[in-house]
Amino acid sequence: MMKMLIKLDEERVRRDGKYKLADMWRVIDAKFDKYDCIKERQADGAVMYSGNPNRDYYTCINLAYLTLKGQRWFAEYCNQWIWYDNDDDEALPFQNLNVLARERTDNPLFAHA
């Protein structure tokens, strides 16, 4: 199973006024809705998207990653982005990859965010 946790700096989005927060989440949600991923809002405002085991969640989560890593607005306002994977073995613990830290190192869009 794969999961992806995303958190935006919602306070800064509102303060800056460049984008509408609802529109940002609508775009992000759309990346996961196509494959019926399960969306869970966390207490801290982050959103956990979990793959639907009855759909091709591998493609879904990979396409979401590939799309979001190219979005300047996402790079600017994302403050948590973690990919969880247990290699489809429910007996294994999830490994997590701090995607945001990696993108800040490797992706010029995220370098100055």
Model-derived regions: residue spans:
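Short hydrophobic/aromatic-rich motifs at helix boundaries and adjacent loops
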Residues: 1-2, 36
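Long, contiguous binding/interaction regions
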Residues: 2-6, 12-25, 29-31
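Short beta-strand-to-loop capping motifs
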Residues: 6-10, 48-55
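Conserved aromatic-histidine-acidic binding/catalytic patches
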Residues: 16, 20, 42, 52-53
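Generic solvent-exposed, charged/amphipathic alpha-helical segments
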Residues: 29, 33, 62-65
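Short, glycine- and small/hydrophobic-rich beta-strand elements in well-ordered beta-sheets
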Residues: 30-50
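Long, continuous compositionally biased terminal/linker segments
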Residues: 52-113
